[in-house]
């Protein structure tokens, strides 16, 4: 008995935080994913496709235009922003999310941590209050420590966390309420992606949605093909025949497979935003 109690004390509290209703059974919820770039949602694509098919409303919000991510000297920032927006719209179509459910805040790629923080949080608060999500998907800011993410991912995770907290207090960014007719909103559930494997407590069976995740990933031609350094347009037929195979291998190699089933893993949290990043405290 003493050994059992000792074991229970050293297990991170987060492993017991799995959703009472399996994600595979969710229906009628509104989902908002906040990411840094126009492909950050890809690691959740199979889960998002499943949720959409199960009668949930799914929105994707991207903080930056992705207008820096290329090694092709022929492409300008403006051109790349347009290319990456269309890639994201096309990818979302593959998983059933319409263009009108895609929001891009227009910040420069690689510079999000230097953006006006109050303004950025205010924009996120606006969309949280407008959409009223039941569940937020975002990069994991960390559990009891800061998770290392590259700059835009790190900034997006903390901006999202702070915006969630601000959105529920009506006297913060009250112009949304007084002028825009929105209402304060508290998000009750969170699905964090991109964190450390040891912190993840929820595996979603996405076996039936693997091919849609692959099809969506193949739309990111400027990022995951030789278009990264020599962009020839969105059609993979314009690239070496090996590109499609390499892209597909990249996508499939990142899919978790156990006992013949495919999964996407998350750190699930239910509760106030103040406790999303730590266990019980005195």
Residue ranges of model-derived segments:
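Hydrophobic side chains within alpha-helical segments
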Residues: 5, 42-44, 155
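Active-site rim/loop-helix segments in enzyme catalytic domains that contact anionic ligands
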Residues: 18-131
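Residues that line or immediately flank small-molecule/substrate-binding pockets and catalytic motifs
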Residues: 8, 65, 106, 140, ...
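Bacterial N-terminal signal peptides
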Residues: 4-14
């Amino acid at each position: 008995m003493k050994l059992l109690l000792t074991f229970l004390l050293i297990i991170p509290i987060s492993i017991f935080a799995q959703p009472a209703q399996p994600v595979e059974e969710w229906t009628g919820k509104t989902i908002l994913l906040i990411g840094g770039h126009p492909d950050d949602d890809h690691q959740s694509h199979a889960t998002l496709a499943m949720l959409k098919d199960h009668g949930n409303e799914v929105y994707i919000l991207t903080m930056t235009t992705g207008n820096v991510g290329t090694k092709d000297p022929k492409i300008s920032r403006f051109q790349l922003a347009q290319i990456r927006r269309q890639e994201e719209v096309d990818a979302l179509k593959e998983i059933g999310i319409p263009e009108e459910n895609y929001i891009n805040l227009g910040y420069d790629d690689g510079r999000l941590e230097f953006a006006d923080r109050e303004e950025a949080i205010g924009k996120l608060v606006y969309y949280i209050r407008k959409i009223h999500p039941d569940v937020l998907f975002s990069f994991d800011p960390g559990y009891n420590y800061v998770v290392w993410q590259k700059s835009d991912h790190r900034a997006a995770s903390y901006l999202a966390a702070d915006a969630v907290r601000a959105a529920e207090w009506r006297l913060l960014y009250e112009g949304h309420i007084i002028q825009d007719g929105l209402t304060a909103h508290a998000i009750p559930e969170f699905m964090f992606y991109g964190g450390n494997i040891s912190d993840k407590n929820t595996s979603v069976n996405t076996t039936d949605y693997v091919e849609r995740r692959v099809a969506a990933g193949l739309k990111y031609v400027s990022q995951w093909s030789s278009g990264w350094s020599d962009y020839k347009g969105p059609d993979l037929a314009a690239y070496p025949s090996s590109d499609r195979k390499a892209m597909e291998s990249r996508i499939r190699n990142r899919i978790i497979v156990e006992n013949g089933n495919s999964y996407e893993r998350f750190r699930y949290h239910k509760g106030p935003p103040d406790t999303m990043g730590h266990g019980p405290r005195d």
